[in-house]
From Swiss-Prot:
Gene name of this polypeptide: PUS1
InterPro entries: PsdUridine_synth_cat_dom_sf, PsdUridine_synth_TruA, PsdUridine_synth_TruA_a/b_dom, PsdUridine_synth_TruA_C, PUS1/PUS2-like, TruA/RsuA/RluB/E/F_N
Organism, scientific name: Candida glabrata (strain ATCC 2001 / BCRC 20586 / JCM 3761 / NBRC 0622 / NRRL Y-65 / CBS 138)
Cellular-component GO terms for this entry: nucleus
Region (Disordered): 1-83, 507-549
The protein, known as: tRNA pseudouridine synthase 1
PANTHER family recorded: PSEUDOURIDYLATE SYNTHASE, PSEUDOURIDYLATE SYNTHASE 1 HOMOLOG
Biased composition (Basic and acidic residues): 53-73, 512-524
Keyword Zinc: yes
Amino acid sequence: MEEVAPEQVQEVQGNTEAHIDSTTASTAPTEALPSDKQSRKANEIDSMADGAPAEKKQKTDQRQIIREPKLDDNGNPIPREPRLPKRKVAVMIGYCGTGYHGMQYNPPNPTIEAALFKAFVDAGAISKANSNDLKKNNFMRAARTDKGVHAGGNLISLKMIIEDPEIMDKINANLPEGIRIWDIERVNKAFDCRKMCSSRWYEYLLPTYSLIGPKPGTILNNDIESSKTELPGVLDEDLESKEFWENFEAAAKKEFTPEEIAAIKDYSPPPREEFDDQEELYQKVKQWKLLENTHRRQYRISEMKLNKFRAAMNQYLGAHNFHNFTLGKEFKDPSAIRFMKEIKVSDPFVIGDAKAEWVSIKIHGQSFMLHQIRKMISMATLIARCGTPVERISQAFGPQKINIPKAPALGLLLEAPVFESYNKRLEKFGYKPIDFSKYQEKVDAFKMKHIYDKIYAEEVSDNVFNAFFSYIDSFNKVTGAQTEESAESNKPATKSIFEFLSAHGIPGIDYGKNEKEDSNKESSNDQVNKESAPATSKPAEAVEQTEKN
């Protein structure tokens, strides 16, 4: 503001007062101004003397705030850095989620975003002045992943300093090997990666021995077998699983005496304070489990069972009410409706030193709810291993509430977010489209080294999938999980909480006639309709595409 000399102020004030006096003298007498008007007039006069309106002067005074310097961890002032321009960018990333409490920033827990943000600051992509607040940098993620979940491709958007042509290499140098930056692309200021993401691809890796039927003597196995007697013809006869367990029993008889086998089956762990890992019987139990795990990893899935699993997964295609596949959603909640665009189940492949067989399931959907994919995988796997009609999945989209357990997080990874519709707008404004396929070779190598190998190794060491399905098989809705022997002894008073997998079906649904006969009739009618449909029929093309996937 231009300074005014004291004599100039006096001159202005004098002229103003003279002007007011002359104006008052030349007019007829009037009522005195109210006090608030007088004070406002006086303020205007003062402001004229200062050379600025009163309101502007007040705002100017308010802006004169003394800012305290930012301090480092030791309490020393952080020197100001030169201000460099920040640009709105999309950062393509991949990471192994092992050891992290999910993607989202959540101090003091280690998260992917915390590691990324630190690397951005250390590399100079974010100034130290803005290093304590993600919001200052307009930080946003395309997809949030939970604890332990991996991503071959994910995307974050934020404002960054990208003048340095080597900024991406510098960021990667400050990141652990399990987190990588694939690329940094300029985007327009309005870009919001979460809202602009049109769909997402997820992958789930599943060992095929997860599809072996429940172990004989468990609660779930007993429920399934008894329901077959009560309602014959509803469930498939799983001769493949029956043969597997018979072969294991034969192998066990070669390694253990009848007395040892009986003692092992009767074994229940003592209280923690009395536990002795050197006890002879406990060592025998460990040998039994080792033999069972070795036998399980030698399992190779049949084409019939794999096709059953594929048919179960295809039940999810299209728009459905997934209220049973998440937490805290009611049937009438419109947000429970989700659309699955494409599902692929790979051919089996053998990998790792253990030579176990796996399949890859890829799911392309517009959006997903909490635990939805893990519950989808779990339901389809339970359907295939129990011989249950695949139509139970479509029935689970109805209003009846059922308990679907969530499969282990170990096999889940985010393949990539998709920005199909927004890419057209980006190109229109002169920006490059967001396309993860450009980095596919690097992403695949990273996934094999830092994600797939860790999944395989963790399953071999911890038997995550076997532990999960063993827990499901022996779960009792009255007393919780129990051993096969205690389940057998309490058989009349126990029933699996997963009764919907048995021939009885989902409670509350009137199946009328034999469910399998009805589904066979529907399949026959569908086949007739397909054969009679014109060659250009779109539904027929859609079915063909689904079968290929």
